[in-house]
Amino acid sequence: MLYRTVPKTGDRLSILGFGCMRYPSTRTGGIDEERTIRQIRQAIDGGVNYLDTAPVYHMGKSEVILGRALADGYREKVRIATKLPPWSVFDRDDMERILDTQLETLQTDHIDYYLLHSLSKSSFESMKMLGIFAFLDSAKKDGRIRHAGFSTHANNAVFREIVDSYDWDFCQIQYNYLDEKNQAGTDGLEYAAGKKMAVMIMEPLRGGNLAGRVPAAIQAIWDKAPVKRSPAEWALRWVWNHPEVTVVLSGMNDEAHIEENLRVADTALPGGLLEEDLATIHRARDEYWRLMKVGCTGCGYCMPCPAGVDIPGCFASYNTHALFPHDRTTKFHYIGQHGGLMGEKSSAGLCRQCGKCAKACPQHLPIPALMKDVAREMEGMMGVVVPVLKGGLWCMNKLGRVRRFVTGDKSHA
């Protein structure tokens, strides 16, 4: 296992991190807890020392099982990363309650890497108003957290704004060879690294879509490469090739995949790809772009939209859905990002057909017409799904408050 250093603290982290959002399941659909614990320990025994979870993963069970997996001396071998969900925070007391509950659930006295989860522009503004920076300072001072950071799928402009707002230790962004100009992108990666922040990477395989069942035209490119690697290895090595990257998270739930990733992480040095390797990856990237429905490059010249549409983000989700029709999560991700579930609504259906974006587009895309296509394909159930999910999040937060009242916990009142 290779390791990279957190610039501000000198902490040494494995370049491969274990993502705890996709635990293996049983035949009946529940989590296979025994197998999950074996897999987590398999990864740790192989050198992984960074594990990433969150309260919402597996409906709250991810943290519980991770806490159990780190018994028998495994806690001392790793760094735990978990997250504060902004959608469950309405005051400073909620911040305190959620963190203390996580410490109890994870069976630990501190969180090594604590993130504000999936920040959008609006959720970040809300958290600032509620005093998030004072909370982070306090939690670091009393030792409950060691490093403060955030994750986000926001665009580059919002990402930079968040980076500049606080003395963060690290951040977590989506990054892979298809997302160089999407969300924070390469520019955001380099900007954060320039601020001496560690950068953790999520979705290096785009939820597994850059591995496994790739389109035939893409597989043909990998098959012709002089070096034989799996699609997953090509994608992981591309991310690790960037020296600004600290940890690459992989949601591993198969023993063979864990072993493959551990093997690759033994030799994936920054700058280690040859020019012919990069050329092969670029051919695959270009073929993916050719297969996409909309030739949006994510340049952002169309932004800001006067109606509030995240035009590049909507196109990115639309293209992903078209490229990987077997992936049932693409519409859910679209709803989560653009349907108003975790921030302000920014969906294609908001488009007023003003045409301002089309005039600014260097690719000369008929954006207003395409927005109709995106809305038609991606938003059919959004009007029902978003209120239901928001109601579920409200109930989860309410239950936490009720439990606190019943148990008489007023330590942070």
Can you annotate each of these PLM segments?
Residues 49, 68, 187-413:
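Structured C-terminal cap/extension of enzyme domains
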Residues 42, 46, 105-106, 166, ...:
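Structural motif
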